[in-house]
Amino acid sequence: QADGAKIYAQCAGCHQQNGQGIPGAFPPLAGHVAEILAKEGGREYLILVLLYGLQGQIEVKGMKYNGVMSSFAQLKDEEIAAVLNHIATAWGDAKKVKGFKPFTAEEVKKLRAKKLTPQQVLAERKKLGLK
């Protein structure tokens, strides 16, 4: 079984070990992941971000970010599921979402076929009502 905390070490350089990000440069995950998971389509969006990256302006907790998140498509499906489970649980976000179910490799595999660009992932974010 993949170790999500260990895989997250690749994310911590930008999003920080505590999930707080770097204001103005890299958005926080802690607290924001719950907001995403609470939206219909939020689970799929989080998977898409890891598979295809994200590019363009977003807003998290009132702060704007305009950068590029790289794709992590090189990770195996079970590794992507494991790191998503880590970010959903490490800072208590999953507890804020009614009926949270752990991410699975099967969910990741289904979305891997989409072949989106980072800009298309941004469009998916906007469909969720997130800035």
UniProtKB/Swiss-Prot annotation:
In its record, the post-translational modification comment is: Binds 1 heme c group covalently per subunit.
Which is one Pfam family of this protein?
Cytochrom_C
Q: Which PROSITE patterns match?
A: CYTC
| GO MF annotation terms | electron transfer activity; heme binding; metal ion binding
Organism's domain of life? Bacteria
Q: Where does heme c bind?
A: 11, 14-15, 69
User: Which controlled-vocabulary keywords does the entry list?
Assistant: Electron transport, Heme, Iron, Metal-binding, Transport
What role is this protein assigned? This monoheme basic protein appears to function as an electron donor to cytochrome oxidase in T.thermophilus.
Supply the name of the protein.
Cytochrome c-552
